[in-house]
């Protein structure tokens, strides 16, 4: 009887609650009597109306729920409007009341059965209610955070990293150049060379017209070359005959059809000194400029064709680190045509002065020999040669020249090591340069740089004329490789430092030429000595003027210093550490070797 009475009392309370709620619907402006008196009952009603989701709320637990905060306490007495309903726990009015009542009423037929045979029920505990309440709070919190996040202003960006900005600016160069230049045109013909590239950027070089570039020679073609290949090379010889290879323009090859000739990642023989991209450079635009001679085309570089010319032969680069730079380029150009396991590189042969790349299938070698002055000097050690006080023996060449015998293609250079001083120290003794206990003799004379350069080349030319068989050996002399230390020479900005951050060639060359520090006296000396040679014809590869435009192609701060990569702090100090002498690879030295290839193909044909 007691349980029945309690049930009737609860029903009466719900009836009064619904009546007051209906009255409040007609007067919604003020806190209702039902809200003030029956808010705890509303919560109990919600709890009892969802028996399968939320068990009835224990009376001992209710104060903990409704009195958690001062805000809810004030709401219970009607001092505040109801808080935003995270889970719609508001008084149910109107149609919602009827739906609640309908859900609470059991089916008529099921009521007696349920009364007679009540199903066993586990008494719900506070933990089950707490779990349901926690789930509702999690959902409400998620919805609140989502809405709140949409209204919040975006977080402020952190202060920019200047180094990252520099790298980003460097990286944008490729996209800018690609937007400025159309894709490379179809293969050019000699009769339409100028018009085919009119839509591309052209950088012209004014040159004197007295260059003797008529190609020919006494050597015969290599044996074992296919007839089709011979016909192709003969046609290329006709294309080159009478062509001024070194007068022309730089053309940006946006499509990359002809430049670069290989990828940095594809050549495992490159040293860290020249791998600029691997060392942190962000743009590769310096790799995409190709040289377009005036009035002709360079033959397409064919590594297999060159290896056929080198079959059973030796090619050797002799000189300073710029010739080593070019030698590395040549190794990368030919190695792509050689299968894995059929190519090797041996360094520091013959007391360290000789490096040998060998293509075993062709029995061919591409070698480099260290001799920065060609004649003997106190800088001849290939690894420890940073000597401030340089001394040369301008009549002593036999020691180095003994390693040049039997070579079929000799490529010489000497220039950059002459630029430290305006005067060179030259030994007075005509004998061996070493005296006494093995040290260099202190008896020397200071000689003007150009005069000493001429005497050294005369010593070298005499050896070539006497020792080289022109029917077996072809000799090339590379002109001066320029440096770029003076931004004011090409109109650089006020804050420009050497060649650092340069990303494009020089485009504002005047008819009088550039003055970037190249010693053109040595250029004239070299040409004069070569013209005086009668027995052996030496090909002068005149790369100086066209290379002066390439301020963008140096290794700059993306290189080594004393055998170690520059640190970020050193890279940030280009005034001290930028290398504006050597060149990135792939890069400008590939063009120099393209000239060699053109001459070798023409001679062989």
From Swiss-Prot:
Residue ranges that the UniProt entry lists as topological domain Cytoplasmic: 1-124
The gene coding this protein: XOAT7
Lineage: Eukaryota, Viridiplantae, Streptophyta, Embryophyta, Tracheophyta
Motif GDS motif in this chain: 319-321
Tissue: Expressed in roots, leaves and stems.
Glycosylation, residue list: 192, 218, 351, 363, 471, 508
Transmembrane segments: 125-145
Protein name: Xylan O-acetyltransferase 7
E.C. code: 2.3.1.-
Any one of the GO CC terms: Golgi apparatus
Compartment list: Golgi apparatus membrane
Record bears the keyword Transmembrane: yes
Task performed by this protein: Xylan acetyltransferase required for 2-O- and 3-O-monoacetylation of xylosyl residues in xylan. Catalyzes the 2-O-acetylation of xylan, followed by nonenzymatic acetyl migration to the O-3 position, resulting in products that are monoacetylated at both O-2 and O-3 positions.
Membrane topology: Single-pass type II membrane protein
Residues annotated as catalytic: 321, 579, 582
Catalytic class of the enzyme: transferase
Side Lumenal, residues: 146-605
Superkingdom, natural source: Eukaryota
Key words of the record: Disulfide bond, Glycoprotein, Golgi apparatus, Membrane, Signal-anchor, Transferase, Transmembrane, Transmembrane helix
Residue numbers covered by motif DXXH motif: 579-582
Region of interest (Disordered), ranges: 86-126
């Amino acid at each position: 009887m007691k349980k029945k009475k309690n049930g009737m009392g609860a029903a009466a309370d719900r009836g009064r609650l619904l009546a007051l709620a209906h009255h409040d619907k007609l007067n919604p402006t003020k806190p209702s009597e039902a809200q003030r008196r029956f808010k705890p009952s509303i919560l109990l009603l919600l709890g009892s109306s969802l028996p399968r989701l939320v068990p009835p709320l224990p009376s001992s637990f209710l104060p903990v729920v409704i009195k958690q905060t001062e805000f809810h306490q004030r709401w219970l007495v009607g001092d505040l409007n109801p808080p935003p309903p995270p889970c719609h726990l508001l008084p149910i009015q109107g149609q919602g009341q009827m739906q609640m009542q309908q859900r609470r009423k059991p089916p008529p037929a099921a009521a007696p059965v349920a009364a007679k045979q009540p199903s066993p029920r586990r008494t719900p505990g506070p933990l089950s209610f707490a779990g349901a309440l926690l789930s509702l709070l999690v959902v409400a919190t998620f919805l609140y955070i989502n809405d709140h996040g949409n209204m919040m202003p975006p977080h402020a960006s952190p202060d920019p990293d200047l180094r990252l900005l520099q790298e980003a600016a460097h990286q944008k160069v490729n996209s800018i150049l690609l937007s400025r230049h159309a894709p490379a045109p179809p293969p050019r013909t000699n009769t339409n060379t100028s018009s085919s590239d009119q839509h591309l950027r052209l950088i012209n070089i004014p040159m004197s017209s007295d260059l003797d570039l008529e190609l020919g020679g006494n050597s015969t073609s290599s044996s074992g070359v296919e007839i089709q290949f011979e016909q192709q090379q003969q046609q290329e010889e006709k294309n080159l005959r009478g062509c001024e290879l070194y007068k022309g323009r730089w053309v940006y090859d946006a499509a990359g059809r002809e430049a670069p000739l290989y990828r940095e990642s594809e050549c495992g023989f490159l040293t860290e000194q020249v791998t600029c991209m691997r060392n942190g450079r962000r743009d590769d635009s310096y790799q995409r400029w190709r040289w377009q001679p005036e009035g002709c085309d360079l033959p397409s570089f064919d590594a297999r064709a060159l290896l056929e010319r080198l079959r059973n032969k030796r090619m050797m680069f002799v000189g300073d680190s710029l010739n080593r730079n070019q030698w590395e380029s040549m190794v990368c150009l030919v190695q792509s045509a050689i299968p894995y396991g059929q190519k090797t590189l041996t360094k520091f042969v013959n007391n360290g002065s000789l490096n040998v790349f060998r293509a075993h299938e062709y029995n061919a070698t591409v070698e480099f020999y260290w001799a920065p002055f060609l004649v003997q000097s106190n800088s001849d050690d290939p690894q420890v040669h940073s000597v401030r006080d340089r001394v040369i023996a301008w009549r002593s060449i036999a020691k180095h020249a003994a390693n040049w015998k039997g070579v079929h293609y000799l490529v010489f250079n000497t220039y950059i090591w002459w630029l430290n001083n305006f005067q060179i120290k030259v030994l007075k003794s005509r004998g061996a340069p070493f005296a006494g206990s093995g040290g260099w003799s202190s008896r020397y004379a200071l000689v003007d740089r150009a005069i000493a350069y001429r005497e050294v080349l005369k010593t070298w030319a005499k050896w070539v004329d006497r020792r080289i068989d022109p029917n077996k050996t072809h000799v090339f002399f590379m002109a001066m490789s320029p440096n770029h230390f003076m931004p004011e020479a090409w109109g650089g900005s006020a804050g420009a430092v050497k060649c650092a951050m340069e990303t494009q060639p020089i485009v504002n060359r005047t008819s009088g030429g550039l003055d970037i520090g190249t010693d053109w006296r040595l250029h004239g000396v070299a040409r004069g000595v070569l013209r005086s040679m009668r027995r052996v014809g030496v090909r002068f590869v005149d790369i100086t003027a066209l290379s002066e435009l390439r301020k963008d192609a140096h290794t700059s701060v993306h290189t080594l210093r004393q055998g170690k990569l520059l640190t970020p702090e050193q890279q940030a100090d280009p005034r001290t550490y930028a290398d504006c002498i050597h060149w990135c690879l792939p890069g400008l030295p590939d063009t120099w070797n393209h000239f060699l290839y053109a001459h070798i193909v023409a001679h062989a044909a």
